[in-house]
Every structure is written in structure tokens, then in C-alpha cells.
Amino acid sequence: MEAANHNNNGCTNESPYISSVLPGWFSEISPLWPGEAHSLKVEKILFQGKSDYQNVMVFQSSTYGKVLVLDGVIQLTERDECAYQEMIAHLPLCSIPNPKKVLVIGGGDGGVLREVSRHSSVEQIDICEIDKMVVEVSKQFFPDVAVGYEDPRVNLHIGDGVAFLKNVAAGTYDAVIVDSSDPIGPAQELFEKPFFESIARALRPGGVVSTQAESIWLHMHIIEEIVANCRQIFKGSVNYAWTTVPTYPSGMIGFMLCSTEGPAVDFKNPINPIDDDASHNKTLGPMKFYNSELHKASFCLPSFAKRVIESKGK
């Protein structure tokens, strides 16, 4: 995920994000999920640094392996990162035939790159990540995630994703994947209408976008706005899907899956299934989470969310 700014309570001499209430525990506290916190026991702090954009920390947890934290908010853990990375990448790419050019916005840890590289039809993978430190730290501490950078099809651009998109020729990409963090601070722009308009312009007719779209348990007001914007901009298909990620707030995260006008895209029925046996080699390892059955099921919504999201289409 890309940069975000969050306020956090609790501090010790070790790190401002180690809880003063539960010594030796990392606690994730944010105005985006008031009244609750998620905590992991810290075995050892492995890295702390401050980039031009955010505070970066890596720690060894007792139960989820190594953990990457940006401005006090968990971005990934070794144990459950597969549930996010595999779904945000394969939901769009398995829904269109033979994707060739893919753009990743954010995703500095390299996990989305790893998943995109499983698709043999892909010829070009561009990634624009704003924070070079995230890339470097991920390569050092999360080699099984950052392995995506080793693919020769990958072109890394360090810079602002919004500006990058504005300079892209119209109709360049088959798919755009936006691996952003929460809509606060530097990532705020990645949830606003002009950004979605830039994505639509950068996609070919019938091209697809997959973007992080928050939790139905915490952010229905944000999701409502995103859905409304997407329905105005993407004239093909607009859908909300979700996955479970234990270390994300509320234990789940959603995605917007949209297509531009052109060849029809039915996201709920994957036409480009990825063969797990053929999708990995010794470098990447097998997929741990995504499969075609889960792909279809991810678009099934609880009634309360379904009512709100469907109402935005009327």
C-alpha cells in the first residue's frame, strides 16, 4: 500500500506505535476506526526509519511473522498478505482475456507485482510508487513479497501516481491496479473523482481497474462515494468485492472492480483462469489464497452493504 498519515496514541522510547497500555505490543489506532484498536505482540523491532513521506517500521510479531507498518498502520504481514495481494491482482486480470500491459499505482512492497507476473500473457508491468524507502525496506525484509521486482517485465517509477497517470497516453493499459492505503494524507487523492477519470483515460476500451476500497464494517460512507464516482466515470461494469485479511481493521478489505466502455467484462465469472500449477515457479511459489471459486464468491455482499451499493446505481 502507498503512503498514509494517521494519528496514533501510545508511545515508548522504542517506537511511538508500541502501546503504553500493553507493553511489548504494537497497537494500531486511527481516526478512521475510532473506538477500537488491533494489537500484535512484538518480538523484536527490526527497522525504524522516516522517509520523505512517512514513518516506516518493520517488526517481528509472535503470530503473523514480519510486519510492515507505515505511519502506525499495518500494510502487510507475512502470514496474511496473500489474501490481499492475490485478490487485488487476480480479480481484474482473470476477468479479461490475455492482459498485456498493466499499471500498478502504489504497491511498493512488490506483492502485487509478484501476482501480476504469474500471468504469462502480460508483456509490460509498470509500477509507480511514491516512497523509495518502502521499496528498499521490502526488498530487505520481505524478499518473498518483493520478489515481484525481479521480473524483467517490471518498470519501476519512483514518484506520484496521480502525476504519472496524467502523463500516460490514452488507452495504454489493459488493467490498472491501485494498491493504496487509506484516504487520508497523501493517499487522499487516490479516492477522488479526478484520479478515477485519469485511470479511465489510461485504459483501453474494455480495460479494467482494481482499487482498494475500504471496509463495509467501517467505511460505508466512503464506499458510497467511491461507488457513485465510479458509476459516473466507468461506463462498462462497476462492482464491489471483498476479502478477509485478519490484520486489517475489521478483518476485511474491499475492492472496486470497474471496466471502461467497450468489450463487456463480467467480473463475477472469470474467463481467464490462472492455473496454479502453471502460475508459479521456484521463485514465486504457489498461490495461497485465490482460486476461481473464491473469485466468484467475493462479489457476494451482506444485505446491508448490497442495499447501499445497489442504491448508488439507481
Swiss-Prot record:
UniProt domain PABS: residue ranges: 23-260
Binding site for putrescine: Y84, D179, S180, S181, D182, Y248
Transmembrane domains' residue ranges: none
Binding residues annotated for S-adenosyl 3-(methylsulfanyl)propylamine, in chain numbering: Q54, Q85, D109, E129, D160, G161, D179
Tissue expression from the record: Root, stem and leaf.
Reaction equation(s) it catalyzes: S-adenosyl 3-(methylsulfanyl)propylamine + putrescine = S-methyl-5'-thioadenosine + spermidine + H(+)
Classification via PANTHER family: SPERMIDINE SYNTHASE, SPERMIDINE/SPERMINE SYNTHASE
Protein name in UniProt: Spermidine synthase
Native species: Nicotiana sylvestris
